[in-house]
Amino acid sequence: MTLLTDATPLVKEPHPLPLVPRPWFLPSLFAAFNVVLLVFFSGLFFAFPCRWLAQNGEWAFPVITGSLFVLTFFSLVSLNFSDPGILHQGSAEQGPLTVHVVWVNHGAFRLQWCPKCCFHRPPRTYHCPWCNICVEDFDHHCKWVNNCIGHRNFRFFMLLVLSLCLYSGAMLVTCLIFLVRTTHLPFSTDKAIAIVVAVSAAGLLVPLSLLLLIQALSVSSADRTYKGKCRHLQGYNPFDQGCASNWYLTICAPLGPKYMAEAVQLQRVVGPDWTSMPNLHPPMSPSALNPPAPTSGSLQSREGTPGAW
């Protein structure tokens, strides 16, 4: 039975872990600037070309684009402040030489020790070098919102990309319709603003559509944007449950409890009660190397049904 490792040394991490925490002010300022930029261009759009269409009886354009703006703004702000699935350290964690094993679809994964958070991280958990935290089911760090994308906020990220695509497309179509219907009128501020907004929307729509396609393919195959090149996983993905199940686990499945750090041990919050770390951790070797019973399920969330942690 081959024992798979889900992290170093067989996984090459794309960015080395920093020795010191990275500054947070400039990335946060950049994320806030993106929100202001969205509001600014939306204000120009609604104040000029969309206003002209509404004044001439075309109320469908402001209603549709207004709804898409609200959805986009909500998803952007929600993603900025969302919890990606942070796993905090616990002081009762065993040392790095202790071996933990978890089973995923009849494959045994040896959990890797995180030297920053001082605990054995589950499969697909990665220590983000920008946030200096371990994120469950890590996908990537999004600098546009200055937040990691992981198990608990991936659906908000997909909603943001989809709503931005629809909103950019709606703004582009609205501006083009406005320019076509005002060809008989002299050049004005409304036309200049419509051209600026249309060019900006078109420039945003192309990369967003490509990103949406890449993420859709990633979800369909239970893949990740961040993917270490594991020699033992070439051509095999034990987390793939099938296209329909992958989409359900990503978008619709319950997120499960949050994990919080206590003074002595890692705890799982379930209302006012909590379950101690031994009930959340996978069993230790060598007993963990025994194959699970046929009735035992696979991991939950984006990995499958409930696992050992």
Swiss-Prot record:
Keywords: Acyltransferase, Cytoplasm, Golgi apparatus, Membrane, Transferase, Transmembrane, Transmembrane helix
Domain DHHC: 112-162
Molecular function GO terms recorded: protein-cysteine S-palmitoyltransferase activity
One GO term (biological process): protein targeting to membrane
Compositionally biased region (Pro residues): 280-294
Assigned protein family: Belongs to the DHHC palmitoyltransferase family.
Name of the featured protein: Palmitoyltransferase ZDHHC19
Organism: Homo sapiens (Human)
Lineage of the species this protein comes from: Eukaryota, Metazoa, Chordata, Craniata, Vertebrata
